[in-house]
């Protein structure tokens, strides 16, 4: 690969790292082309880009990032990077699900907002709620509160009317 092309790749990877909410490093040695295509399809479904990049080029792209040196141990053997642009935990869910049926895919490490997660923390990451799930829960909570306010107001009004009715009956 020519130097110009390498510099172009470094720039592309650095730009994707800067745009990503989560960066995941995986090892894919032994994964067939068909399985790799299937994995990429699964990543695309959740808005994640998965790309094979040489370790030296990833190191150069990470050079300007704070805390990037913490990812250096993960840059050994074959490396592919999953860029989680919209949701930082979406790649973890795909990696965990796919690696259950494909031993060749191994999670190396991840970085989410500068916090580095090791290979033993994949289950923790994959069980976190996605951005969409969090929004759904928040909307449900808000909806519950909003719908209960009229019921509370109606109950107070009903109790007031009953109390006034009782007072009126006593005065008669």
UniProtKB/Swiss-Prot annotation:
GO CC list: large ribosomal subunit
Pfam families: Ribosomal_L10
Any one GO BP annotation for this protein: translation
Entry keyword annotation includes Ribonucleoprotein: yes
InterPro entries: Ribosomal_uL10, Ribosomal_uL10-like_sf, Ribosomal_uL10_bac, Ribosomal_uL10_bac_type, Ribosomal_uL10_CS_bac
Cited PROSITE patterns: RIBOSOMAL_L10
Function per UniProt: Forms part of the ribosomal stalk, playing a central role in the interaction of the ribosome with GTP-bound translation factors.
The name this protein goes by in its record: Large ribosomal subunit protein uL10
Subunit structure, interactors included: Part of the ribosomal stalk of the 50S ribosomal subunit. The N-terminus interacts with L11 and the large rRNA to form the base of the stalk. The C-terminus forms an elongated spine to which L12 dimers bind in a sequential fashion forming a multimeric L10(L12)X complex.
Family that this chain belongs to: Belongs to the universal ribosomal protein uL10 family.
Molecular function as annotated in GO: large ribosomal subunit rRNA binding; structural constituent of ribosome
Keywords: Ribonucleoprotein, Ribosomal protein, RNA-binding, rRNA-binding
